[in-house]
């Protein structure tokens, strides 16, 4: 399964390993096994584990300006050791610090970090689930045309079976703000700026409790 990761998440190798290079001043040549396999090549800067590719691209923004972007593609069938993790950040941190803390917590080696949500004044406005625990819920209300409305947002997550799912999500008030999946954005259409005047509930037709192990979400659904 190939996944184009478009959110703030980590792809991490499930096993921790230390790679080191040792040398000495000895003139004695290393012993070579005549029938043994060729040694693995030394890791190079920027190398990623098997199954993970990162492609850099640029795009012209006009006016002599360019943007620099990256596309990360993970093939979990090619490398089952790759893992998708959502990381909750109550405080702002650099990717380097996130990677270091991820490793120090013995969670593996972080390979790619991507922003996957919205925030305002230091507070998350997006759904985030990690280890099956809901750490942040999506912004349940917004103001449009001086009215309070209830947008249903999209989310991307991995289930306990390993399967990935995308759903329209709302954390319902009548079931402790747990995330529920809906078959559509319901009566919300951001293209026409029309929204629901009342929040969906666990009893809304098509509602189903959603229990991912890792998930992020908060905006409109672009690809499914």
Map each language-model feature to its residues:
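Bacterial N-terminal signal peptides that target proteins for export
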Residues: 1-9
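Sec-dependent N-terminal signal peptides of Gram-positive bacterial secreted proteins and lipoproteins
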Residues: 10-16
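C-terminal motif of bacterial Sec signal peptides marking the signal peptidase cleavage site
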Residues: 17-21
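Short hydrophobic helical membrane-anchoring segments positioned at the boundary
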Residues: 24-25
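Zymogen propeptides
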Residues: 29-174
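Intrinsically disordered, low-complexity segments enriched in proline/serine/threonine
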Residues: 31, 36-45, 181, 185, ...
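A substrate-binding/cap region within the structured catalytic cores of diverse enzymes
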Residues: 144, 148-217, 223
């Amino acid at each position: 399964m190939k996944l184009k990761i478009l959110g703030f998440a980590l792809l991490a190798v499930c096993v921790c390993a230390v790679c080191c290079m040792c040398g000495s001043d000895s003139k004695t040549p290393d012993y070579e096994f005549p029938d043994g396999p060729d040694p693995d090549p030394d890791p190079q800067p920027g190398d990623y584990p098997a199954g993970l590719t990162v492609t850099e691209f640029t795009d012209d923004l006009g006016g002599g300006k360019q943007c620099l972007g990256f596309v990360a593609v993970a093939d979990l069938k090619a490398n089952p050791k790759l893992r998708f993790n959502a990381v909750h950040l109550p405080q702002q941190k650099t990717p380097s610090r996130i990677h270091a803390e991820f490793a120090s917590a013995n969670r593996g080696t972080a390979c790619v970090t991507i922003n996957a949500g919205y925030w305002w004044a230091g507070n998350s406005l997006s759904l985030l689930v990690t280890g099956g625990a809901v750490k942040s819920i999506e912004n349940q209300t917004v103001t449009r045309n001086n009215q309070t409305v209830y947008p249903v947002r999209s989310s991307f997550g991995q289930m306990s079976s390993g399967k990935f799912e995308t759903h329209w999500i709302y954390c319902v008030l009548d079931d402790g703000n747990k995330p529920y999946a809906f078959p559509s954005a319901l009566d919300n259409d951001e293209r026409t700026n029309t929204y629901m005047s009342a929040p969906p509930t666990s009893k809304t037709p098509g509602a189903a409790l959603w229990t991912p192990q890792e998930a992020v979400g908060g905006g409109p659904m672009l690809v499914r």
